[in-house]
Amino acid sequence: MSRQSKKKGRSISGWVILDKPKAMKSTEAVSKIKRLFNAQKAGHAGTLDPLASGLLPIALGEATKTVPYVMEGTKTYHFHVAWGEERSTDDLEGVVTKTSSKRPTQEEIFALLPKYTGVILQTPPQFSAIKIAGNRAYDLAREGEIFEIPPRQVKIDSLELIGTTDQGYSIFEMTCGKGTYVRSLARDMGHDLGCYGYIADLRRTAVAPFCENDLITWDALKAAIPHENTTDENCIPLKQNFSTLDGLLIETDVALKCLAHYTLNQIQAQRVRMGNSILLCDQNMPTSNIDICVTYKAQLLAIGTIDQNQFKPKRIFTTL
């Protein structure tokens, strides 16, 4: 999975599906993983709030080219909603802005769920990374600015009430599309139920195609490096000790299960490597303007657009 390069770090490629702990920022997690693997390049496929835990897909090397396709995948969340308070951030971190003595019954909650299933309009939280006139909403909110975030369409595939905690929080599980804010959902349900609500606990359990079975903890990653061979407090391993750590990576092309795959011959592969379009005459080839993957000798070669049997490469992979 790795090769020599003049650039700083190793040209290592693959996915780390990190079980992000609470209090760790997503950018911090990426930096830690990048240092641990001594990777040239790293990025994540979907931010998790610091107060949230769970599945954070982190791409290394050539896998960063597949990040947009993972971000388009469905996400699954397990979360607790506390009723009776509205908070500035719509989660535990914020200050209380409104209170109510009312607590919803299970029947009232069940009756509300269909409203929040399917394609809905949702307004992101004031404390979010949405850009308003070039500024992040959370920066404006911290400065006390008054502003509005326009609602946008999101898709919620399923929303279930699955229990109640000892503290009286309602436990939900939701599968949704890109751009859905769980904090906004808690806020909006609280308004509809006449009692206010905020997120008391949030865990992401899936980002298609990755699931809980793919998760690995930070401690497990560090344990893959013999302690006596670490070079500093960041647990950066010596070159000869990367093999165990590299074996924990998920292959780059796993992220592309959502795309159709087609095999090229040698001449076609050479043209694609040079960034040229090619004609593909497979009778099963889609004719519409969609993305597909092409491979050569069972190796991922490129992602591109197919239209009227013409394949135009958009992202070309070096040898993985």
Curated annotation (Swiss-Prot):
Catalytic activity: uridine(55) in tRNA = pseudouridine(55) in tRNA
Keyword annotations of the record: Isomerase, tRNA processing
Active site: 49 (nucleophile)
Family matches, as Pfam families: TruB_C_2, TruB_N
Gene3D superfamilies: Pseudouridine synthase
Keyword Electron transport included in the entry's annotation: no
E.C. number(s) listed in UniProt: 5.4.99.25
GO molecular function annotations of the record: RNA binding; tRNA pseudouridine(55) synthase activity
GO biological process assignments: mRNA pseudouridine synthesis; tRNA pseudouridine synthesis
Alphabetized InterPro entries for the sequence: PsdUridine_synth_cat_dom_sf, PsdUridine_synth_N, tRNA_psdUridine_synth_TruB, TruB_C
Function in brief: Responsible for synthesis of pseudouridine from uracil-55 in the psi GC loop of transfer RNAs.
HAMAP family from the UniProt entry: TruB_bact
Matches recorded under NCBIfam families: TruB
Record-stated family: Belongs to the pseudouridine synthase TruB family. Type 1 subfamily.
Official protein name in the record: tRNA pseudouridine synthase B
Source organism (scientific name): Bartonella bacilliformis (strain ATCC 35685 / KC583 / Herrer 020/F12,63)
